[in-house]
Amino acid sequence: GSEMCIRDSYNSDGKYIINLDSDGMLEKNALVNMITRFENDTAINCMTGSILTVPEQIKKYKAGPSRLLRELEFMEYAQAFLAGRSYASELNSVYTLSGAFSAFRKSAVLKSWMYNTDTICEDTHITFQMRYLQKERVEVCEDALFFVDPIENVNKLYTQRQRWQRGSLEVSKMFMDKSFKVKNLFTNISVKTLLYDHTFAFPRPVSYTHLTLPTKA
């Protein structure tokens, strides 16, 4: 989907290219906030929005493990985008654009290899292109909010995190010759982020949820 949209952009007349997941929902001012950020800083060529789960949908679940899973997921997204990536944005160390909501200046995208379908994490691949090949800043627009449905169940959450892990490893391998090496653990933020994600961040909601589930006698 994303790859086809980017390729179709060759024939577009617009100044910006914005990718959105079809099953999410934009906050009413999200696009205005993002384009305003682009217009106010011509040095920015790619940004990710802030992704959150829909709070109203979380309240529909019965109190207990089911609701707790969705509450933990919401807090994880809030921490990742409104705190973690916002701070990383200031240091130009955002690991990946969000596949659910990201935006580019068309001029920057047309210099890239576009989305790569050899990996299941095309969003991470184009992020690495921007950072390592084109030397672009990758930033977060904190007030450009995009809401997604809460995860369906623990199995879906596990599958989602497994897919993210696999994708990040695939992309890392593709960029091993672009300073993405283990020897750069203490100097390259992407290496540190990869190691952290594969030890603490990705399994966190699954682990928290299992700790709260009642055990059989």
Task: For the regions a language model picked out, list residue spans one by one.
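Short aromatic/hydrophobic "clamp" motif used to bind/position activated sugar donors
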Residues: I17
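Acidic donor-binding loop at a coil-to-helix junction in glycosyltransferase catalytic cores
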Residues: I120-I126
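Conserved small/polar residues in nucleotide/adenosyl-binding loops
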Residues: G1-S9, T209-T215
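Basic/Trp-rich segment in TM-proximal cytosolic loops or flexible interdomain/linker regions
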Residues: L91-N92, E152-L211
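Long helical/loop segments within the catalytic core of UDP-sugar-dependent glycosyltransferases
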Residues: R7, N33-T119, Q162-Q165, L169, ...
